[in-house]
Amino acid sequence: MIFSRYFIPIILTLLTSSPLFVDADPNMEELEGTWSSKSNTVFTGPGFYDPVEELLIEPDLPGICYSFTKDGHYEEALYRVKPNPKNHSCAVASVTYQHGKYELLSNGSLVLTPIAVDGRQLLSDPCNSEDPSKSTYTRYVQSTWFKTYQVYVDSYHGRWTLQIYQFDGSKMQPLYLAYKPPVMLPTIALNPTDEASETASTLGSVSHKIKRSRMRIKRSLENQYRTNAKREIYTEKFDKIWWSSVFCLALASSYFFLKR
């Protein structure tokens, strides 16, 4: 009687309020999709970076987004703002795009290796630049190593969540599954270069290859709204877990009232 009155409600509360973790063994299939931070304004794909015009498109709010395919490709879109508490007009903002291949190690670590020629960053540092009204646009390449990650259903938001742990074990902000399959630009080199000798024939050949590559990318961008990617918020698996929890709660409540 005492157990049913005091301990069953506590156990059920913990059951229904805790994150529901799945897939104990790390695998690429559980990573597949586009994962975006809580601001829900930063997404990978052509809406963030236009490789034909080499244009970074600034989102409405800061945030981060990572997309993964199940065959080892990734893309990242980062919009970060670092405030200056002493002078609010000196905030540093950066918009960063990279894509490439990732490796999932046996210990659960993630190693992201970008395509060096494709990374781009737009940096605004008004208090440390000659012209505060202008931002700096540069090539950017930075490999990344994440210590580990977890994929689970957040019971509060009811969404699939990706929790990444940085190299030092600290948590990144949680990312929520937005699209599956992922929304990404082509996984090939978007801005290829060639270091061959600069003869006329070589330059013509390289120019032709780059032109063909850009045409493929352009066609991909034209088809961006024909993607079969779906926004993933509620899933059948989560519904089963949720209704199982509701059934357990109802059963325990009935037992509690019948015993009184």
Swiss-Prot record:
Record field: transmembrane: 241-258
InterPro entries the UniProt entry points to: Rot1 (IPR019623)
Cellular-component GO terms for this entry: endoplasmic reticulum membrane
Subcellular location: Endoplasmic reticulum membrane
Glycosylated residues in this chain: N87, N107
Family: Belongs to the ROT1 family.
Role of this protein: Required for normal levels of the cell wall 1,6-beta-glucan. Involved in a protein folding machinery chaperoning proteins acting in various physiological processes including cell wall synthesis and lysis of autophagic bodies.
Designated name of the protein: Protein ROT1
Species, as recorded: Candida albicans (strain SC5314 / ATCC MYA-2876) (Yeast)
